[in-house]
Amino acid sequence: MEPVASNIQVLLQAAEFLERREREAEHGYASLCPHHSPGTVCRRRKAPLQAPGALNSGRHVHNELEKRRRAQLKRCLEQLRQQMPLGVDHTRYTTLSLLRGARMHIQKLEEQEQQAQRLKEKLRSRQQSLQQQLEQLQGLLGVRERDRLRADSLDSSGLSSERFDSDQEDLEVDVESLVFGTETELLQSFSAGQEHSYSHSTGTWL
């Protein structure tokens, strides 16, 4: 933006100079030399005498160059007017007023750019802070998830050991009942055998 502002400043100076020259031409007086003291009047150097044909040719070339320069300046001013905000009325404008308005518009754009840059820095700082908070929360969630998995693993291990103990107790009960049942059956069969032998021996004796 700075080169544009400097260019506008140069155009402002040129426009002021042109308008001053036009006013001087309208009123028919010469301006003071800008580089001399206020009391001195500019004196134009006398041009060397030239042939009429060469003078007319040089004047024609000068006029053509001046026309081209003015046409180019007019196109540039028209493009500049189109770049101005729509709310500003430049339907009837002078070169100086248009350039001043353009300079004010550029200054306003520079202020808006600075505000946008400050807002951008603020948002970047806020984003970094939120990113750090997110990483901290993810770390806490990871720790809690590991603790939950560890607790579930311990609970499942406890249930497995309880089931194993219960199965062992049931197995011991079944073994005891099997052992006791076998002893009872043996005693019953042994008693039945003795009675049978007693009856057989009694019959023999008789």
Swiss-Prot record:
Any one GO molecular-function label of the UniProt entry: DNA-binding transcription factor activity, RNA polymerase II-specific
Entry GO CC: RNA polymerase II transcription regulator complex
Interaction with SIN3A and SIN3B: annotated span: 8-25
GO aspect biological process, one term: regulation of transcription by RNA polymerase II
The keyword ATP-binding is assigned to this record: no
InterPro entries: bHLH_dom, HLH_DNA-bd_sf
SMART domains listed in its UniProt record: HLH
Principal subcellular localisation of the protein: nucleus
Gene3D superfamilies: Helix-loop-helix DNA-binding domain
Subcellular location as annotated: Nucleus
Record-annotated bHLH domain positions: 57-109
Keyword set, alphabetical order: DNA-binding, Nucleus, Repressor, Transcription, Transcription regulation
Job description of the protein: Transcriptional repressor. Binds with MAX to form a sequence-specific DNA-binding protein complex which recognizes the core sequence 5'-CAC[GA]TG-3'. Antagonizes MYC transcriptional activity by competing for MAX and suppresses MYC dependent cell transformation.
PANTHER family to which the protein is assigned, alphabetical: MAX DIMERIZATION PROTEIN 3, MAX DIMERIZATION, MAD
Subunit structure: Efficient DNA binding requires dimerization with another bHLH protein. Binds DNA as a heterodimer with MAX. Interacts with SIN3A AND SIN3B. Interacts with RNF17.
Annotated protein name in UniProt: Max dimerization protein 3
UniProt gene name: Mxd3
